[in-house]
Amino acid sequence: MKRFVLLIMAICLIAPNVEAQNKQLERKLKQEYKTKMKEYKKEGWKLFGSSHSLDVALLTHYDKLKSLGEDGREVLGIASRFKSKNVGKQMAINNACVTYAQQAGSYVKGRVVSDMAGDGVDADAEFDNFYAAYERLVEKEIKGELSESYCIIHDNGDGTFEMQAYFIVSESAATKARIRALENAAKESAAAQRYAEKVSEFVREGFETE
């Protein structure tokens, strides 16, 4: 009975905190929406590949992020100065995957250097091959986890265009993708195999996408 009462008390304490966090997230997303719409209209961006209005697409985007809560991540892909819109779209998709992979690789490298160098590990020499392999494999694995949200295009006025493609990824799914990349990258690195448990811990940690 005592445990039950303690459990109820814990739930009562946690619930208001979760609700406050959700409201804070909602306010943040609303502000981002207003800022983005103002920016897009000012710079002449148009929605690409959708029958919806840009306003609706952006509202839907932030609604998806809100529903995912802390598990939702936005990933941006950029393509510049292209003439074929289809080619530009593929460039933006590839850029999103490459950007995410580079951020994932940089995060793990930073953690290895800061946490393991003090243990006498020569991070640069021992992990050099691993970093490159890990980024390459994350780029491959994350592509299947990115869900396209909306895409905008800008006419440069000289026959070329700029494109920004926005994707949403679930952090839990992204973590699994990074783990798959780690498992394969470790095959190319004796150091990653030797320190597998520690490196796996770094890979599982989330990081802020830019």
Locate predicted features:
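N-terminal signal peptide c-region/cleavage motif recognized by signal peptidases
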Residues: A15-N17
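Domain-level marker for long, solvent-exposed, non-transmembrane regions
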Residues: A20-E210
